[in-house]
Each structure stands twice: as structure tokens, then as C-alpha cells.
């Protein structure tokens, strides 16, 4: 949940709340003069208007072509909630967000994702090329501790026959996983800290346990729960396609998709103050317009 995103959501809500209220009222009164709703709205529109009108417009365009269900949004929401654990509610509250407003942003992100996926080549030829270097997801559990001495202590207890899940609950500082035996969600290449990923993929059999691994978070001891099993292209095709599509969700590809969708939607900006809002999508600018007059 990036700080810029959170700030943007807050500003968007404030901007359009002011628009809905209409002009005329004062938001601040001083002996030196008052700040009116109109002044505040105009200032916020000037600073944030282009960014927000882009999103609102693309919500209309993409929402007309692609389906994002409440279940899709809830799933992504719960992923964030799990990621931030006990701090999630505090992050929302400190940012002036509600679950509803955050879910609204998530829905937009998912619309962009679906549009990008729909505009991505997933022919067998493309997927077979990707399959040559593709690795399946794996599932591991881990015990995270702060220092090497504690990691070695846990490692010795495992060698002495202690159960991994019991030690995760007792020692792990990862509050999101410790009560579940330390088990993480399935992941593939490029999703974890490089040192963690290398050590995890080096475990070939279920039940294999790594030596302590140092990352920016501390020291991990990793247990393989479900190793990677690559079979044949036809059998793995569904997973390969999902992995390939995810790999294509780059900023560049999403921008290309939005440009295409914008062009197909016949967009006309009626507000002269926002005439440059879509210059990155149609190649126009106010200077171009002025020079053509």
C-alpha cells in the first residue's frame, strides 16, 4: 500500500466531496479573509484534477468491457490485510481511508490488470517459449528470528526432533504466519527476497529444511512443504499461462493497454482546464492545440 496511493485516495475523496457540495460555503474563516469551497476545489482540481479524471474515465471505459466481481476485490483486499496483519486497520485509519474507499481503488487496479491480460498474446507458441525457463510455484514454511544465535538455537532444536510448526509458533517473529506453522502462500521465482528464494528452491523434497538464511528481515529457517514439480507443457499449461500473464503486468504494458483502450473509446474532454489530462494517451497537449488555432 504505497504512500502516494493512499494520499491520492484521500485527495480524490476530498476533491469530489467538495464538487458535490456546490460552491458558496466557507471552509476556513479568518480575520484576514475566508477560504471558500470554490477556492479549495479550484486549487485541488489544478493540482490533482488530471490524475483523478484519468482514473474516473478509465473506470468507465474498462468497466464497460471487463468484469471485476466483489469476490475479486475481496480476495485482493484480504491479501493486503494478511500482508499488514495487525497494522492494517491502523494504516487505513492513519491515512483517512475506509475499507470501502480502499476497495474502490483495488477494483480499478484489477480492471487495469484484466484489460492488460486481455491484450496479451497467450498463444501456445508464446507460452511454450516461456515454459522453457518457467519454474512452478512452491510452498514453504519458515521461522523468522532476529539474530543468528537464535536461528542456530532453533536449528538445533529441529535436529533434536522438535516439530517445525511448534517452533514456528514459539520463536517466529512473523506474526502473520507463526500460528499457521510458519507456512507462506505459494510463490514463484522473483516474488521473494533473492537469498530466501534461492534457499527455498534448493530444497527438493517435502520436509527438507534449510540452514539459517539471512535476509533484510532477519534469519529464516525454511521447510519445504510442496516442492516444484514440472511435468509437461499440456499438464502445466494453466499454471504456465497464469505465471506468464503475471509477468506481463509491467508498467509499460499496462500503459500500452490504456492507450489502446483510450483510443477505442472515443474520449472527448469537455472541461478546458483538464484538456491536457490525457496527453500521455492521445499524444496531444495544450501547446499542440494552441498552435493549430
Swiss-Prot record:
<keyword id="KW-0472">Membrane</keyword>
<dbReference type="InterPro" id="IPR000297">
    <property type="entry name" value="PPIase_PpiC"/>
</dbReference>
<dbReference type="InterPro" id="IPR027304">
    <property type="entry name" value="Trigger_fact/SurA_dom_sf"/>
</dbReference>
<feature type="lipid moiety-binding region" description="S-diacylglycerol cysteine">
    <location>
        <position position="21"/>
    </location>
</feature>
<dbReference type="Pfam" id="PF13616">
    <property type="entry name" value="Rotamase_3"/>
</dbReference>
<protein>
    <recommendedName>
        <fullName>Foldase protein PrsA 2</fullName>
        <ecNumber>5.2.1.8</ecNumber>
    </recommendedName>
</protein>
<keyword id="KW-0449">Lipoprotein</keyword>
<feature type="lipid moiety-binding region" description="N-palmitoyl cysteine">
    <location>
        <position position="21"/>
    </location>
</feature>
<keyword id="KW-1003">Cell membrane</keyword>
<keyword id="KW-0564">Palmitate</keyword>
<keyword id="KW-0697">Rotamase</keyword>
<comment type="function">
    <text>Plays a major role in protein secretion by helping the post-translocational extracellular folding of several secreted proteins.</text>
</comment>
<dbReference type="GO" id="GO:0003755">
    <property type="term" value="F:peptidyl-prolyl cis-trans isomerase activity"/>
</dbReference>
<feature type="domain" description="PpiC">
    <location>
        <begin position="135"/>
        <end position="226"/>
    </location>
</feature>
<comment type="similarity">
    <text>Belongs to the PrsA family.</text>
</comment>
<dbReference type="InterPro" id="IPR046357">
    <property type="entry name" value="PPIase_dom_sf"/>
</dbReference>
<dbReference type="GO" id="GO:0005886">
    <property type="term" value="C:plasma membrane"/>
</dbReference>
<dbReference type="InterPro" id="IPR050245">
    <property type="entry name" value="PrsA_foldase"/>
</dbReference>
<dbReference type="GO" id="GO:0006457">
    <property type="term" value="P:protein folding"/>
</dbReference>
<dbReference type="InterPro" id="IPR023059">
    <property type="entry name" value="Foldase_PrsA"/>
</dbReference>
<feature type="signal peptide">
    <location>
        <begin position="1"/>
        <end position="20"/>
    </location>
</feature>
<keyword id="KW-0732">Signal</keyword>
<keyword id="KW-0413">Isomerase</keyword>
Amino acid at each position: 500500500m504505497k504512500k502516494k496511493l493512499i494520499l491520492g485516495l484521500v485527495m480524490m475523496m476530498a476533491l469530489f466531496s467538495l464538487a458535490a457540495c456546490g460552491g458558496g460555503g466557507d471552509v476556513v474563516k479568518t480575520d484576514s479573509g475566508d477560504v471558500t469551497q470554490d477556492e479549495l476545489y479550484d486549487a485541488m482540481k489544478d493540482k490533482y484534477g488530471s490524475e483523478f479524471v484519468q482514473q474516473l474515465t478509465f473506470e468507465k471505459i474498462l468497466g464497460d468491457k471487463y468484469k471485476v466481481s466483489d469476490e475479486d476485490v475481496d480476495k485482493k483486499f484480504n491479501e493486503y490485510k494478511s500482508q499488514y496483519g495487525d497494522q492494517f486497520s491502523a494504516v487505513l485509519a492513519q491515512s483517512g481511508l475506509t475499507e470501502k474507499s480502499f476497495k474502490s481503488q483495488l477494483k480499478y487496479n484489477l480492471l487495469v490488470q484484466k484489460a492488460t491480460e486481455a491484450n496479451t498474446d497467450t498463444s501456445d507458441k508464446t507460452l511454450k517459449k516461456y515454459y522453457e525457463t518457467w519454474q512452478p510455484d512452491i510452498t514453504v514454511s519458515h521461522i523468522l528470528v532476529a539474530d543468528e544465535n537464535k536461528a542456530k538455537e532453533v536449528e538445533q532444536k529441529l535436529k533434536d526432533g522438535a516439530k517445525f510448526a511448534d517452533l514456528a509458533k514459539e520463536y517466529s517473529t512473523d506474526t502473520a504466519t507463526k500460528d499457521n506453522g510458519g507456512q507462506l502462500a505459494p510463490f514463484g521465482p522473483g516474488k521473494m527476497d533473492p537469498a530466501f528464494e534461492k534457499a527455498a528452491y534448493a530444497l527438493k523434497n517435502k520436509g527438507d529444511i534449510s540452514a539459517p538464511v539471512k535476509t533484510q528481515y532477519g534469519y529464516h529457517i525454511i521447510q519445504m512443504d510442496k516442492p516444484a514439480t514440472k511435468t509437461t507443457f499440456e499438464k502445466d499449461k494453466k499454471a504456465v499461462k497464469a505465471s506468464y500473464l503475471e509477468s506481463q503486468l509491467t508498467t509499460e504494458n499496462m500503459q500500452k493497454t490504456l492507450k489502446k483502450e483510450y483510443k477505442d473509446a472515443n474520449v472527448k474532454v469537455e472541461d478546458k482546464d483538464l484538456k491536457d489530462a490525457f496527453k500521455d494517451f492521445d499524444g496531444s497537449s495544450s501547446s499542440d492545440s494552441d498552435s493549430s488555432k
